[in-house]
Amino acid sequence: LFIKELITDIRFSQLPCMRKYALLLLLLVNSYLGYPQNNVNNLPQVLLRFDDIGMNHAVNTAIAEVAKTGIPFSASIMFACPWYQEAVDILKQYPNADIGVHLTLTAEWKNYRWGPVTGRSAVPSLVDSLGYFLPSTTAFQQSPYKLEEVEKELSAQIERALGSGLKVSYIDPHMGIALSTPELRALTEKLARKYKLGISTLSEVTYYGESYNDMWGEPVATKKQKFMKVLDNLSSSAPANMVVLHIAHATPEMDAMNDMNSSMMSNNASQHRQTELNMVLSRSFRDQVDKKFKLVTYRDLIKQNGLE
């Protein structure tokens, strides 16, 4: 279109013949050389979702390192955790970060627990005798939780996020709980409609048709191999190939973390999370961006497909 407009421009028509041909040739070459960059839109789309952001300092410094690379990504923040404000302050600096609310109803780490944003007295059916969230999905589902208290607490987490100054795109369930029963799923969908947010899941049943891949349960020794295998087998038909990651720096703080739900993570969560961070920072991953696949976020998917 630009070339056609140029040809009809009176100034172009006044150029000597040879200069016209030279200019047209230059424009065509530039257009050709620019084609691979434009063609990035035809590549499979990969969506990196980083969970548990705001959980502790080691997680926050890890997401800061990812953000500094400039790659687009989605970050699910736990607004019920003590370190959430640091995560907010970090991610405000990076427009490449898309923000989600990691809806939290459990506190799974031994000797490092958190409770409801609303306060223990406001949602007594959601907490243990010490006022903390229950330690596991099973414990939560077997408890006499009240749906109206779940709604009150999750609404408070979303409103804390919306009031943080970050632009929030979506909500997703920590440990899958907020989507784990028909009643909880209906409630989460209600909240998404109320606050005009998308929903990301922790299963293969997704809202935007994105494929689901999770590195969490993979042994440290084979994590990167699995990650690269996912990238070697991307679906071009899916709106996005989502990869859920849990990252952190292997610091003394993270080394002391003990997941009460997983023997694999009970004393090795630090190495798991450092390995997943290393995968995303690796040259072998970074060299494939915009060549083998295009990185997108939930903000992009919502823009492409709408909220419903």
Predicted regions and their residues:
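Active-site gating loops and adjacent loop-to-helix segments of metal-dependent hydrolytic enzymes
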Residues: R113-F140, N258-N268
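Catalytic domains of cell-wall/extracellular-matrix polysaccharide-remodeling enzymes
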Residues: P144-S236
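Boundary/entry segment of secreted carbohydrate-active catalytic domains
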Residues: N39-A64
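Structural preference for beta-strand elements that scaffold enzyme active sites
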Residues: Q45-L47, P72-S76, N96-H102, V168-D172, ...
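Acidic (Asp/Glu)-rich catalytic clusters
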Residues: I63-T69, E86-D98, P116-D128, G163, ...
